[in-house]
Amino acid sequence: MSETYRHFFVKALYDMRESVILGMDQRRKPQEKEGTKQMKFDMHCHTKEGSMDGKVPIDDFIAELIRKGFNGMLVSDHNSYNGYRTWKRNIKDQKFKDFVVLKGIEYDTIDAGHILVIMPETIKLKILELRGLPVQILIDIVHKNGGILGPAHPCGEKYLSFTNTLKKRNQMAVMNQFDFLEGFNACESVESNHCAKVLAEMYALPAFGGSDAHKTDCVGMAYTDIPEQIHCESDLIRAVKLGEGIKCGGSYYRGTTK
């Protein structure tokens, strides 16, 4: 997408955000909760054990997030749960007992870029580790099994992001089926994140913040504040469906790669 086209695309999104004529899903807008302690998560984390391009072992990832004041993380390796498995088999109940590690995945669809998926802790689906499903089939599988999903870096690079991969005529119908989206990614541009936040407003979706870290110096550069006590995947799913008071933000990673 050229810079000129991207500029007009973002402006058009902004201008349309309050539109009802286009038939957008006008779900209840999130309201901020009072009197509840926020939990701070990095919602986009790649580990050495689970991602081929990941450089940070999961125990080092956790230690760095704790040092930066985080309460938890969503492990979201590329088409793999191996990072989470390493934590569950070798680290859980031995170290970092007050830190919440949630099981997620960054799934590579054939037609809509990368999608973040979170399933209830009781559900195990091997198909989610086999990349290449069409996004509509992925949505159906996830929702039928009680999970939630949303696009990672939705306005990012071609073939990796939703708005620059899925055919434009199909985007609205699919957006209305997502449960959240990534509103701030530390490895994306200012423009890309602005576009993502406009989409979140248009479709009244909770917006996650995630570092998308593959290296130590990127860990924890983005955050998601959740006004709920989150101890497992089902807690997160419930909080996202409630949609109240979830906030995101962060800083920009200036390294040449993630």
Segments and roles (model prediction):
Residues 5-64, 70, 82-91, 96, ...:
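Charged catalytic cores and adjacent phosphate/nucleic-acid-binding surfaces used
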Residues 71, 99, 146-148:
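Loop/turn elements at helix/coil->beta-strand transitions in domains of secreted/extracellular proteins
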Residues 74-75, 150-151, 182:
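Conserved beta-strand positions in the central sheet of alpha/beta enzyme cores
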Residues 79:
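Acidic, metal/ion-coordinating pockets
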Residues 129-132:
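Glycine-rich anion/phosphate-binding loops
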